[in-house]
Every structure is written in structure tokens, then in C-alpha cells.
Amino acid sequence: MDNISQWSCEKFVNETSSKAPVPGGGGVAALVGSVGTALAGMVCNLTTNKNEYKEYEEDFKRILSDSKVLQENLLSLINRDAENFLPLAQCYKMKTDTAEEIAKKEEAMQTCLKTAISAPAEIIKITYEAIKLQEELRTKAPALTISDVGCGAVCLKAALQSGWLNILINLKLIKDEEYIKSIKGELLPLVEEGSNLADKIYENINSQLNS
């Protein structure tokens, strides 16, 4: 399979809009999240090693390093999401002419559905951490870069919530109630807290730019 993360922007968009099974919502979520973290990196690169921003020099360097790791992890999840989804797509094509075939398909489906959830789950965890970095940047970034911080937060919220929707669509077909409870218990608090924090960042910056 192609390394989707190395496609041009044009190819990614065209393939997403085609009948191809991937990239889909999960891959798009990972890409949007990666772009959001990249904006944090840009802000930090514009401010490090400059005397006027020396007060937060070490903070900017740390945020730059951390956001770069998150950015690369999200990029890798574009491919992982595609690789995990393709077996599930094949499950839908399995025969169901006999009771044995129905049982075999159902067993395969349950396994593949859980596998398909793993990449969006990681997207949620990573974007949650990235949003917290954006909040720190909001309090320290120069005024001329504050809109980029806000754009990053908005992108990350979109990725966070998109990851959750990709999980929910698969959870609806999973029969393991304990698994469902575990996934929701682990990830829903991150989605809610991360979304609220991203909204706070946006509203604060929007107010600041309108004043």
C-alpha cells in the first residue's frame, strides 16, 4: 500500500473524494491534527533564539520538540488507519449464504472492528495532548502569531472530534459490552475536555483579536 502521508495535497484530496476505501474520516482526522500541531511548531520556530522572546525561550523549545513528536505520530496514523480499515472493508464482502459463513463473517467483523478503532483512539490521545500545548502557547506566544495558535486549536478540535466519530461508528457494531464501556470510559473524557479547552482557546483569541 502507498505511503499516504507522502502524497501531495492534491492527490490526498482527490483520493479522499473518490470511491477508494481509504483515506477516509480517520486519515483526514490524522492529517488535520498533524497540521494543527505544525502550526504550534511554526509559532515556536518564529520565536526561539530571539531576544524579545527570551523570557519563554525554554518553553518554546520544549513545546517545539513535543509538538514535532505529536505531528509525526499523527502523520504515521494516516497510514495506520488505512491499513487497519482495509481488512474490515474485506469483511463486508464475505459470503453469508450458510450459517457457517455467517458465523465466520461475524467473528472476523468483531476482530476487525476493534482493530479499526485503534488508530482513531490514538488520534484522540495525541490531539488532546496537542491542544494542551496550544493553550500554553496562547499565554506566551507573541501577538502577531496568536491567530496561528487559534487556527491550530481549531484544527486539533476537528481532529479530536473526528476521531471520536470514527470510533462511535464502529462501536455500534461491536457486541462486546465490556470493551465498549472501556473505550468510552477512557476516551470520552479526553474528547470532552479537549473540545472544551479548544473552544476556550478560540474564544479567548477571537475576543483578543476583536478588541
Regions inferred by a protein language model and the residue ranges of each:
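Polytopic transmembrane helical bundles with strong interfacial aromatic enrichment
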Residues: 4-7, 122, 169-170
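Conserved phosphate/anionic-ligand binding catalytic regions in large, soluble enzymes, centered on
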Residues: 18-39, 145-163
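Amphipathic alpha-helical coiled-coil segments
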Residues: 67-74, 120, 127, 187-194, ...
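Phosphate-handling active-site elements
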Residues: 39-59
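A structural-propensity feature for long, helix-poor, extended segments
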Residues: 52-88, 190
